[in-house]
C-alpha cells in the first residue's frame, strides 16, 4: 500500500495527499507532519516494511469537510486520493486514484468558500508589449480576462483579490518585482503559456471556431492567460465545467481607475486598523450571497458613464417611492439563497438534494419578482423582469420528484417522492412493510389451502418458507416445493416467496441505487438550464445591491446625487459615511461643503491643526464621489458630481522595507504615479505630502507638485491638498485657481477645541504640542517643546523664512525652482569637497576611518 501511496504522491509532490484507507483519510511522511500541525491531530507512526516506520496522521472520512478547509486556508494544495472500488469485492489491494486536487483558487467546498466573496483563480502571462491576466471563480462560473501594462494588471489583481495566481515557471522574480509577494502562487510549465495551446483549449471548451463572439479575439496575452486557467482545471481533475459558459473582457474604459493605494487608503473593502470599519461594511445591506459578492465588485469598479449610473440611481429612487414594491422584493430575496453557486454545483455534479430543493424555492421566489419588475414604472426594472427566466418545467419537475425536506446526501435515501417511479414504490412497500406483506401471504395461503396453522417464517439456510404441520400436509398445493422435513412438520417454498425474498433482501440497496439514478437524471436535466439560471442569479444580485443602496440611504439620510458630464464637483453639507456611523450616541457629524472645478477653484489647499479633520474631509469627498458613481445615494444635503474618470489618493504612507523603500520613497512613488497619469477628469487627494524629509525639501516638493497640477497644459485635475506647510498659503496670491481653506479650531485658556468646520483662508498654526499634551506626553517634554517652538518662531521671523523669500518664489516661477537657502559656509564647502573627491570603491576600512577622523578635525577647527 505504501508503494501505491508513493506512486500517487509522485504525481503531486507539492500537495498534501489525503489517502483514503477504509473509513479514514490518512497522511504519511512529511504530509503527516504538516497535517498534524495545521489540523491539530495526533502524529503517530505506522510500519513501513523491514522494521521501518513512517509518520502518519489521519481523521475519519466523514470529517473531510471540517479538515479540508483548514488545510486550504493555510495555503496548502490538497490531493484527495479515494478508493476506486469496493474493498468487499476484491481480494487484492484496493485500487486508488486522485479524484480531486483542491487548491486555494480551485474549490467548490462551502466550508472553504466565503459566501460574501468570490474565490478567484488568476493567471498572468508576461507578453512582449503587455501583460495578460484572467480570472475564474469555479464556484460561480465567472470567467474574465484583460491585458495591459503592469500597473493595470496590478490594479486588477488587487481589486479582484485572487486566492491563487498561476504564472510561467521561472518567472517568479518578474512576477514579484511587478506584483509583490503577498499572493499564493503556482508555476506551470512554459508550454501551457503558448497561444496555440491556449486557443485550442478555449475553442474546445466553448465549442466555437473563434473567440470573436466573446470580444476577446484581439487580446492575445489575455487569451493565453485564460487558456492556462482551463489547463490548470484539467490538471486538478476539475473537468465538469459546463457552467463556465462565456469569457468576458474587463472593459477598462467603462470604469473609474482606482489603484491599490486608493482602494487601501480610502478603506473601501477593509479597514487599515484592527476592528475598524470600511465603506463596504457601512453600505452592505444585501440579502443574497450573490448580491454581497457583486456589491464588493461594484465598490472597486465605479462607473464613469452617465447613463448606467443614472439607471442604477433610478432603481434606488423607485425603491424609495414604492415601499410595497420594496417590501415584496425584500421578502422574496430572503428565499433565494446562493443561486449562483448552487447552479455551479449542478454543473460539476456536486449538488446535494437540499440544494436542489433550494433551487426550486429560488425559482418559485423569482416569479413574483419578475411580475413586479415587469409592472414597475421603471425601464431598468422592466429590463430586469424581462431577463428573469422562471424555468417552469424544471422547477415543477423538482417539486414533483424531490421531497420537500430531503436528507443532505443522496446515499441516505428518502430523496425521491412516492409516486415518481413504480419500481421504487414497490421496493419501498417491501422494505417498509415487510411484515405486513408476509402476513398477507400467510393469510391468503391459509384461506386458499384450508390450513389454519400455516405460517411463513425465515432462516439463513434457505430463506423464506411456509411451514405446515403433518396433519395438513395432504392439503399442500402441487406447485409448492418441499425444502425440509421436521418431526411434526414440513417446510416448503413457493415461487412467490423466492421473488419476494430477492426483493426484500436487496430492497434497501436497490432503493439507494434507483433513487441515485432518478436523482442523477434530474440533475442532468438541470444542466440544460444552467445559462438561464446564471442570468437569473446575475439579475437578482443586481436587484439586491440596489435594494441595499435604498435601505442604507433611508437609514442614514442619504440623498440622490446629480450626475453631470462636466468638471464641477459641488457637495453641500457632505458627511463621511463611515465616521458618522462610529460616533458616540448623541454626537453629530460636522458636515462641510466642498466645491471644485477647472475654472475658478481647481485646487484647494487645506491647512489646520492635527486632529482637526483634514484627512477625513479629503476621504469623505472621494467616498461621496465614488458612492455616486456606483449608483448609490450619498451622505449630503445636495451633491452635483461632475463625472470622475480616476481617483488618486496619497493619504498616509508606510515604508516598504522588503524592497528597500523608505516611507518617503513610497510617498514619492505614489505621487509620481499620480502626476504621470492625471487627466482633466481626475480627482486628486494629497494629504501631508513631503513630510518624510527635511522641512525645506518637503515644502519644495509640495509646492512644485501643486504648481505642476495647476499649470498642466491639458489636465486641470480637481485637487484637495491638505498640508502643515503653511508656506503654501502664499500660492493663492499667484495662482488663480488655487484657494486656501482651513479646518477651524478655537483656543480657549490654552486649550484647543476642534470645530471641524472648513472655512475660507489659510491657517498659521498646527497646534502639534497641544495634541502631544492630549496624548499624555510628559509635562516636562510639553513645556520644553513650547520653549523651543517660541525660540524657533523668533529665529524664523528674524531671518524672514516665512516672509519675503516665499513671496518672491510665488512671483518668480521660472523653471519651477524654489531656492530657500544656499550652502555658503566655507567649512561645510570644504567637507563637501573632501567627500566628493573620495574614491569609495577603492577605499579600505582603515582609510575610511582615517578620512572620517580628518573630517572630524576640520569640524573641530571650526
UniProtKB/Swiss-Prot annotation:
A matching Pfam family: MutS_IV
Name the residues that bind ATP.
608-615
Q: Which InterPro entries match?
A: DNA_mismatch_repair_MutS (IPR005748), DNA_mismatch_repair_MutS-lik_N (IPR007695), DNA_mismatch_repair_MutS/MSH (IPR017261), DNA_mismatch_repair_MutS_C (IPR000432), DNA_mismatch_repair_MutS_clamp (IPR007861), DNA_mismatch_repair_MutS_core (IPR007696), DNA_mismatch_repair_MutS_N (IPR016151), DNA_mismatch_repair_MutS_sf (IPR036187)
Instruction: Report whether S-adenosyl-L-methionine shows up as a keyword of the record.
Output: no
- S-S bridge residues: none
User: In its keyword annotation, does this UniProt entry include Phosphoprotein?
Assistant: no
State the function annotated in the UniProt record.
This protein is involved in the repair of mismatches in DNA. It is possible that it carries out the mismatch recognition step. This protein has a weak ATPase activity.
**What is the name listed in the Swiss-Prot or TrEMBL entry for this protein?**
DNA mismatch repair protein MutS
Native organism: Bacteroides thetaiotaomicron (strain ATCC 29148 / DSM 2079 / JCM 5827 / CCUG 10774 / NCTC 10582 / VPI-5482 / E50)
Gene for this protein?
Answer: mutS
